[in-house]
From Swiss-Prot:
Myosin regulatory subunit that plays an important role in regulation of both smooth muscle and nonmuscle cell contractile activity via its phosphorylation. Phosphorylation triggers actin polymerization in vascular smooth muscle. Implicated in cytokinesis, receptor capping, and cell locomotion. SMART domains: EFh. This is Myosin regulatory light chain 12B. GO terms for cellular component: apical part of cell; brush border; cell cortex; cytoplasm; cytosol; extracellular exosome; myofibril; myosin II complex. Ubiquitously expressed in various hematopoietic cells. Residues 29-64, 98-133, 134-169 form the EF-hand domain. It comes from Homo sapiens. GO terms for molecular function: calcium ion binding; myosin heavy chain binding.
Amino acid sequence: MSSKKAKTKTTKKRPQRATSNVFAMFDQSQIQEFKEAFNMIDQNRDGFIDKEDLHDMLASLGKNPTDAYLDAMMNEAPGPINFTMFLTMFGEKLNGTDPEDVIRNAFACFDEEATGTIQEDYLRELLTTMGDRFTDEEVDELYREAPIDKKGNFNYIEFTRILKHGAKDKDD
């Protein structure tokens, strides 16, 4: 009988552990950033992100998403998207990205002088003509917040850090 109690306790604790692992994946400042993003998307402030919230958020960014596009986004979640689900989905997406050194090494292949930078025009040419080709608009979007100095050098080491860990505040 005591073994049944132990099994029951273990079974009850598993979902809790899975949930707390989501929060353990990120540091406190990252969780706060995700919370702010969640609140910006949750337009009606009901604690859940629904299709209308997504539509309103994308519309505020100048996009005009189709119902099919919104449905596809909503179907990525196994259920209602509360903050914990939102964090879980981001955790899964971030874990699905390549390790930092793999991303950095991919850029380094085009950095013949090992400076940690690539000329932005050269990178644009590579991105729009090789492999899974980017459109000019996609490259513009990438460059919008990218670490590019006044001479047009794209700092791929810093970009990789931002990609994996988030942007530093401008005040830091």
